[in-house]
Amino acid sequence: MAITDILSAKDIESALSSCQAADSFNYKSFFSTVGLSSKTPDQIKKVFGILDQDKSGFIEEEELQLFLKNFSSSARVLTSAETKAFLAAGDTDGDGKIGVEEFQSLVKA
Protein backbone atom coordinates (compact mmCIF):
# COMPACT_ATOMS: atom_id res chain seq x y z
CA MET A 1 0.00 0.00 0.00
CA ALA A 2 1.26 3.46 -0.91
CA ILE A 3 0.75 6.52 1.26
CA THR A 4 -1.03 8.12 -1.72
CA ASP A 5 -3.73 5.43 -1.46
CA ILE A 6 -4.82 7.21 1.73
CA LEU A 7 -3.62 10.81 1.36
CA SER A 8 -3.72 13.04 -1.72
CA ALA A 9 -0.46 13.83 -3.51
CA LYS A 10 -1.43 17.51 -3.53
CA ASP A 11 -1.89 17.60 0.26
CA ILE A 12 1.39 15.73 0.76
CA GLU A 13 3.23 18.24 -1.44
CA SER A 14 1.68 21.15 0.46
CA ALA A 15 2.54 19.66 3.86
CA LEU A 16 6.13 18.92 2.85
CA SER A 17 6.66 22.41 1.42
CA SER A 18 5.66 23.92 4.76
CA CYS A 19 8.52 22.20 6.61
CA GLN A 20 11.45 22.28 4.19
CA ALA A 21 13.67 24.36 6.46
CA ALA A 22 15.51 22.62 9.29
CA ASP A 23 13.66 22.79 12.62
CA SER A 24 10.42 23.94 10.93
CA PHE A 25 8.55 20.62 11.33
CA ASN A 26 5.41 20.78 13.47
CA TYR A 27 3.56 17.48 13.66
CA LYS A 28 0.16 19.07 14.41
CA SER A 29 0.20 21.35 11.38
CA PHE A 30 1.75 18.60 9.22
CA PHE A 31 -0.99 16.08 10.13
CA SER A 32 -3.64 18.72 9.48
CA THR A 33 -2.20 19.91 6.14
CA VAL A 34 -1.56 16.39 4.85
CA GLY A 35 -5.16 15.48 5.71
CA LEU A 36 -4.34 12.76 8.22
CA SER A 37 -6.19 14.44 11.11
CA SER A 38 -9.51 13.95 9.32
CA LYS A 39 -8.98 10.27 8.48
CA THR A 40 -10.67 7.31 10.20
CA PRO A 41 -8.85 5.31 12.90
CA ASP A 42 -8.45 2.46 10.38
CA GLN A 43 -6.87 4.78 7.78
CA ILE A 44 -4.54 6.22 10.43
CA LYS A 45 -3.57 2.66 11.39
CA LYS A 46 -2.70 1.96 7.72
CA VAL A 47 -0.47 5.05 7.61
CA PHE A 48 1.17 3.85 10.85
CA GLY A 49 1.90 0.54 9.09
CA ILE A 50 3.69 2.40 6.30
CA LEU A 51 5.72 4.50 8.77
CA ASP A 52 6.66 1.39 10.80
CA GLN A 53 9.41 0.43 8.34
CA ASP A 54 10.67 -2.62 10.25
CA LYS A 55 7.13 -3.86 11.02
CA SER A 56 7.91 -4.05 14.76
CA GLY A 57 4.53 -2.62 15.73
CA PHE A 58 6.23 0.60 16.84
CA ILE A 59 7.73 3.70 15.27
CA GLU A 60 11.19 4.02 16.79
CA GLU A 61 13.39 7.13 16.87
CA GLU A 62 15.30 6.12 13.70
CA GLU A 63 12.01 5.70 11.81
CA LEU A 64 10.75 9.05 13.11
CA GLN A 65 13.87 10.77 11.83
CA LEU A 66 12.99 9.48 8.34
CA PHE A 67 9.28 10.35 8.81
CA LEU A 68 9.03 12.87 5.93
CA LYS A 69 10.76 10.49 3.49
CA ASN A 70 7.72 8.18 3.76
CA PHE A 71 5.72 10.93 2.06
CA SER A 72 8.35 11.77 -0.60
CA SER A 73 11.77 10.24 -1.20
CA SER A 74 13.14 13.74 -1.89
CA ALA A 75 12.02 15.09 1.50
CA ARG A 76 14.59 15.90 4.17
CA VAL A 77 15.27 13.94 7.34
CA LEU A 78 14.09 15.48 10.60
CA THR A 79 16.73 17.17 12.74
CA SER A 80 17.69 15.56 16.03
CA ALA A 81 15.72 18.22 17.94
CA GLU A 82 12.62 17.71 15.76
CA THR A 83 12.85 13.93 16.13
CA LYS A 84 13.19 14.08 19.92
CA ALA A 85 10.28 16.55 20.25
CA PHE A 86 8.11 14.39 17.95
CA LEU A 87 8.96 11.27 19.98
CA ALA A 88 8.32 13.03 23.30
CA ALA A 89 4.91 14.21 22.07
CA GLY A 90 3.84 10.76 20.90
CA ASP A 91 5.45 8.45 23.45
CA THR A 92 2.89 8.69 26.25
CA ASP A 93 3.97 5.52 28.06
CA GLY A 94 7.67 6.43 28.11
CA ASP A 95 8.99 3.30 26.38
CA GLY A 96 11.04 5.27 23.83
CA LYS A 97 8.86 4.45 20.82
CA ILE A 98 5.39 5.20 19.46
CA GLY A 99 2.78 2.43 19.29
CA VAL A 100 -0.27 2.47 17.04
CA GLU A 101 -2.64 3.78 19.75
CA GLU A 102 -0.14 6.49 20.69
CA PHE A 103 0.14 7.45 17.01
CA GLN A 104 -3.64 7.65 16.61
CA SER A 105 -3.85 9.90 19.70
CA LEU A 106 -1.02 12.09 18.39
CA VAL A 107 -2.72 12.50 15.00
CA LYS A 108 -6.02 13.47 16.63
CA ALA A 109 -4.41 15.78 19.25
Swiss-Prot record:
Ca(2+) 1 binds at D52, D54, S56, E63. Ca(2+) 2 binds at D91, D93, D95, K97, E102. CDD domains: EFh_parvalbumin_beta. GO terms for molecular function: calcium ion binding. Disulfide bonds: none annotated. GO terms for cellular component: cytoplasm. The modification N-acetylalanine is found at A2. The keyword rRNA processing does not apply. SMART domains: EFh (SM00054). Signal peptide: none annotated. PROSITE patterns: EF_HAND_1, EF_HAND_2. Appears to promote immune maturation in bone marrow cells in culture. Binds two calcium ions. Belongs to the parvalbumin family. This parvalbumin has an isoelectric point of 4.3. This is Parvalbumin, thymic. It comes from Gallus gallus.
